[in-house]
Amino acid sequence: MESRATAKFMRVSPRKTRLVARNIDGLPVEDAMNLLRFTPNKPAGVLYDVLRSALANAQQMPGVDVDAMVVKQVVVNEGPSWKRFLPRAQGRATRIKKRTSHITVILAEGQE
């Protein structure tokens, strides 16, 4: 059985989030949660919340062994960017793109 959770429009850069997501792909859920809990950056906290949500979704399914769940796949897609301007010298302005992410975590029952 598979369980999934999605968080959309999260205010974290997709590029930085993918760096953290690669670390938990294929790990048992308990190990992935420990890794994310002690990773000191913002994407780790967001991924931790999505992973907890996927685990809670798995607990709602009958006949699923939550202790044997493994992170099957983590997908981080780019969401819309917020466009902002930063004032610069001599009346100029520079564009800033505040990027957002769509994060999907898929859990599956597997071998540890």
UniProtKB/Swiss-Prot annotation:
Q: Tell me, what is an example of a GO biological process annotation in this record?
A: translation
Is rRNA-binding a UniProt keyword of this protein?
Answer: yes
User: Keywords, A to Z?
Assistant: Ribonucleoprotein, Ribosomal protein, RNA-binding, rRNA-binding
InterPro entries, A to Z? Ribosomal_uL22 (IPR001063), Ribosomal_uL22_bac/chlpt-type (IPR005727), Ribosomal_uL22_bac/org-type (IPR047867), Ribosomal_uL22_CS (IPR018260), Ribosomal_uL22_sf (IPR036394)
RNA-binding among the record's keywords? yes
Gene Ontology CC: cytosolic large ribosomal subunit
One Pfam assignment: Ribosomal_L22
**SUPFAM superfamilies registered for this protein in UniProt:** Ribosomal protein L22
Recorded GO molecular functions are: rRNA binding; structural constituent of ribosome
* Entry function: This protein binds specifically to 23S rRNA; its binding is stimulated by other ribosomal proteins, e.g. L4, L17, and L20. It is important during the early stages of 50S assembly. It makes multiple contacts with different domains of the 23S rRNA in the assembled 50S subunit and ribosome.
**Assembly and interactions?**
Part of the 50S ribosomal subunit.
What is the similarity comment for this entry? Belongs to the universal ribosomal protein uL22 family.
Q: What is this protein called?
A: Large ribosomal subunit protein uL22
State the organism named in the record.
Nitratidesulfovibrio vulgaris (strain ATCC 29579 / DSM 644 / CCUG 34227 / NCIMB 8303 / VKM B-1760 / Hildenborough)
- Kindly list the organism's lineage: Bacteria, Pseudomonadati, Thermodesulfobacteriota, Desulfovibrionia, Desulfovibrionales
Q: Which gene encodes it?
A: rplV
